[in-house]
Swiss-Prot record:
GO cellular component: nucleus; RNA polymerase II transcription regulator complex; transcription regulator complex
Ranges that cross the membrane: none
Family: Belongs to the MAX family.
Reported tissue expression: Expressed in D-type motor neurons.
Main location: nucleus
Encoding gene, per UniProt annotation: mxl-1
Keyword match Nucleus: yes
Start and end residues of each stretch annotated as Helix-loop-helix motif: 43-82
Positions in coiled-coil regions: 86-113
Function noted in UniProt: Transcriptional regulator which binds to the E box motif 5'-CACGTG-3', when in a heterodimeric complex with mdl-1. Involved in the control of lifespan in response to dietary restriction, the decline in protein homeostasis associated with normal aging and may overlap with the insulin-like signaling pathway. Involved in promoting infection by the microsporidian pathogen N.parisii. Required for the expression of svh-2 and the promotion of axon regeneration after injury.
Pfam family, any one: HLH
Protein's recorded name: Max-like protein 1
Amino acid sequence: MSDMSDLEDDQTGHCGSGEHSGPFDPKRHAREQHNALERRRRDNIKDMYTSLREVVPDANGERVQASRAVILKKAIESIEKGQSDSATLSVDVAEQESKNAKLREEIARLKAKKDPSSSQSIIQ
């Protein structure tokens, strides 16, 4: 049998394995379809792991190729760090907004003290 036997068999409509002599073997066709679908699924997962490894800090700088478990672990660590940093920054923003509001009030108070007629205009 040549490497092209499957292609030749598909073109003639006959099964190359000799299992069935009919023009079309539904079981073989279903198996081939399933195998092709499974191969595409595995390729897609492999591509996604590669993409994830490239964007996750510390997973792309290793000399040896990181295992899938290491890639997922690093991704989880990166996400958790990002969430922690985000929470910390949110607290910092709230503190700065509070300080700004107090400073605006102080500016308005000092302006009113300096010029009582301008007490109506508050800095926004």
